[in-house]
């Protein structure tokens, strides 16, 4: 008696995939060992992969693809392969017009770094990274539909109410918000936080 296996082929290597090694993603079968990022070749997990038109990527490279091209068009920018290159690619300064094509110019209200569309949260005409959009008191995750803001500082509703109950007013929060804004501005300007005077 012989076991013939399945007729399903791995999309990556086109060889037969047996049930014990079958991984099915987006309705397509792969060997576990063939389920890799197209760009870096690292092994992927079903819980942490992205695909575009059947091409597999790890989450960081999928996001990088979007950031570099401004769209999900499956093409990473590849460096020119010229033999007479005298300076490494990473040390070159961008041209004057490069800023016009580098995506968004929006800055995060919390960290002052560029916010790309894939990681953007906008509330009250302020833009944040998803990772920066959290309660300033406890670091709790918040959402655009479940937060409170005072003087531009974000809070979860629980901590906002708790801080009000502690003092009976929001005056101490306004002072704290002013200090946090001053410290953030100093960090963005390159001044050490210890030298920022408290008001």
UniProtKB/Swiss-Prot annotation:
One of its GO terms (molecular function) is metal ion binding. Expressed in roots, leaves, stems, flowers and siliques. Barely detected in pollen. GO terms for cellular component: cytoplasm; cytoskeleton. Residues 8-68, 106-166 form the LIM zinc-binding domain. GO terms for biological process: actin filament bundle assembly. Cross-links actin with a constant of dissociation of 0.5 uM. PANTHER family: OS06G0237300 PROTEIN. This is LIM domain-containing protein WLIM2b. It comes from Arabidopsis thaliana.
